[in-house]
Amino acid sequence: HGVEFYPAGRGIGHQIMVEEGFAWPGTLVVASDSHSNTYGAVASVGTPIVRTDAASIWATGKTWWQIPPVAKVTFTGILPPGVTGKDVIVALCGLFDKDDVLNHAIEFTGSEETMRSLPMDSRLTIANMTTEWGALSGLFPMDGVLKGWLKGKATTAAMGLADGPFKTLAARNFTHPAIEQLFVNPLTADKGAKYAKELFLDLS
């Protein structure tokens, strides 16, 4: 059936989903673990499901998701050297600690300059820990930072330098034509999109 099987010892599940290109920008990805929000770092709406829902997906190939309220989190300023994504999400959890985003989908945004100061490792950490903040998902934009990371993966894969036991998989999923096609019509919020709430954090 074309199922890729990763036995015990092959790596952390969420890391594999990102590193091997299963969590792909512009897609919805579900998994039976509360930190499936991690995939939002690569502009994939990742959200957890319970194991019975996972079983029904195996049986039917279908699932459902009740669309949650959306909270827009706007970053301003520039992340200083030595400050990490963990610092950012811990600050968000501490500053907005009254169930502000409980069961919300979060959309992270900011100016090009601001978002450029948030590298992929920081985005992965922030998206991962939106679970601790009470959110159902945490989505970062399809921007230059993501594109640069994807192109780096594609170049590494094309050169046969991908790490791990699944080199061929990385090469198949990460290609320059596929990445260029993604950014022809990138995932963006509709003009005039309305949000349940808007929060702001100065990274400086």
Would you name each region that the model predicts?
Residues 1-204:
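Fe-S-dependent hydro-lyases/dehydratases of central metabolism
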